[in-house]
Amino acid sequence: MIRLENVSKTLSPRFTLAPLSLDFENGTTTVLIGPSGCGKSTVLRLLAGLVTPDSGTVKFGEETLQAGNAQDLRLRMGYVIQEGGLFPHLSVESNVALAARFLKRPEPEIRKRLDELCELVALSPALLKRYPRELSGGQRQRVALMRALMLDPGLLLLDEPLGALDPVTRHALQKDLKTIFARLGKTVIMVTHDMGEAAHFAGELILMRDGRIIQRGTLDDLLKRPADPYVTEFISAQRSPLERLGSAA
């Protein structure tokens, strides 16, 4: 289990992540939703050890994330951001295998893993020799996912992974990602501001606003048992994405 225990973080005079406690069961998919600037990405960065909490602790099982073990714990997680974050001067293969080669994993093991990941994300192995600029947006995000999965982490952190894609590519990758998550059985924590996208992926949603958790529950919980008027307001503003999701089911 992954836990945030009474964690807070002030990023600027205008934004503070209020003390919050969250736990994420192994093998589940949870989506953090809410408007831009509400603290969703800050939660991911805290989990990844990219920022240090002002108070509280981040725990992986019984281990507390701290400076001394942050690098080791990061090897257990994969991180995908909106634009992919690929190194433009490296080939696709070098981007994906970067961490494995830094850790001096055997080359036959790396080759085998590259083949497995190409099959998993439906990317042609021929693209491994290309550079990110030669790929479409959807292909770059598939490569970013491959890189995140290279070391077979138990945790995937996805920060708006589909946000920069056109609608057609986004829809296709959305379906593929859900299949991949189900196949891998990993703990997935994803950030989006799109309610339809959140409902597509998650068993459980966490709605945030102004650095606070407004409600945590299933889509049905949020629709039928809103804990705050803002829950209904947020969902109503995104009624069209939810209706599209329902019509596609």
Regions found by a protein language model. Give the residues of each.
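Helix-to-loop junction immediately C-terminal to a conserved catalytic motif
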Residues: 48
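Conserved ABC ATPase "signature" C-loop
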Residues: 210-211
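ABC ATPase "signature
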Residues: 216-217, 225
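ABC ATPase NBD coupling module
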Residues: 64-78, 102, 108, 222-226
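Conserved ABC ATPase "signature" region
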Residues: 108-126, 179
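Conserved ABC ATPase signature
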Residues: 131-135, 139
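Conserved catalytic motifs of ABC-family nucleotide-binding domains
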Residues: 152
